[in-house]
Amino acid sequence: MAPSISPVTQPLVSMAIAPTVVIRSALAKAGEHLQKLGSKGLVVTGSHSAELGEKSLQTLQKNYGLTLPLASYLPDCAESSLEQLRRRVHQEQPDFILGIGGGKALDTAKLLAHQTQLAIATVPTSAATCAGWTALANVYSETGAFRYDVALDRCPDLLIVDYELIQRAEPRLLVAGIGDAIAKWYEASVSSGQSSDTFTVAAVQQARILRDILFQKSAEALAQPGSETWREVVDASLLMAGVIGGLGGANCRTVAAHAVHNGLTQLPQAHHALHGEKVAYGILVQLRLEELVSGNQLAATARRQLLSFYDEIGLPKTLQDLGLGRISLEELRQTAEFTCLPNSDIHRLPFTVTPETLMAAMVSTLVEEQGTRQLFAQIQDNSGL
């Protein structure tokens, strides 16, 4: 007789793994899928993305009988913008929200749909982030400083991947998307690398595969926009990165790279740098922290590998590369202190990080190994940076 299995009480885990439907299609031909969400959609977008999608939206309205009024998310994915958009929803009474644009436009659209309990469709206009896929949104101040993130109850109902639209974006946006996506490995392996949870293990392994794809194919993709390799890298940055976040969920969080990004957004002069550019720099800072505090030689090797890769595709390696070479010591400290706030993801590192240690890492992303222990000793002695 088989042994009986005792029921085990487990906490309820809510997983938002993927959009309900993902289609690779020109936006103008996606009318049948949008019709399943309703006949009227409020289009949340910015001025540039509205221009890019204008003809497609006109075609959707003409050929599929959709009503698609426009609403701007500007000045940012901020509480004030969301308040204005909620009033617009009340006025228009749409059946669904249609987000068209980059990460902030899509985050705003997702949050608006979440707050108003409407269906949501996303149309990324670049491969700069995986925001079109995920059940997460970042909220900023009106001037672009990171404030907090919001976990949403589901991924978008529909994700439309229009490669022709994405190819019209400047190459810098894909480079930034590569930087944002490759962070999945360096952060997930630290935050969740020892987990035995099946989905978390799958997410971490997918992050490793994602890293390898980007290492192998990014340079060729950037040299041949529109090619099959280019599409593979777009898919990796836009879709596969989203899969990892969906599988790993709360157990597979960001760590220092995104925390450094959030800190940098507190500086107005950093706002011209793209999300993925700041995250890519943040990966180097995270690896430097592992070297400085733990003497981790694997981190040193990984940093050298990344520096070579960054040179190859044009990602920033230093504050100067981000246009922040002239920030004051006080501004650097302000950034570090925000990054080290008690609720920051930087504390997912397996050691304590102080603002002073972080400042040292931020200004030494190019330092050779032999200077690491000496630099950390100076920090410990409070003898300056």
UniProtKB/Swiss-Prot annotation:
SUPFAM superfamilies: Dehydroquinate synthase-like
Binding of Zn(2+), residues: D180, H258, H275
Originating organism: Synechocystis sp. (strain ATCC 27184 / PCC 6803 / Kazusa)
PANTHER family: GLYCEROL DEHYDROGENASE, HYDROXYCARBOXYLATE DEHYDROGENASE A
Pfam families associated with the record: Fe-ADH
Protein name in UniProt: Uncharacterized oxidoreductase slr1167
Top EC category: oxidoreductase
Required cofactor(s): Zn(2+)
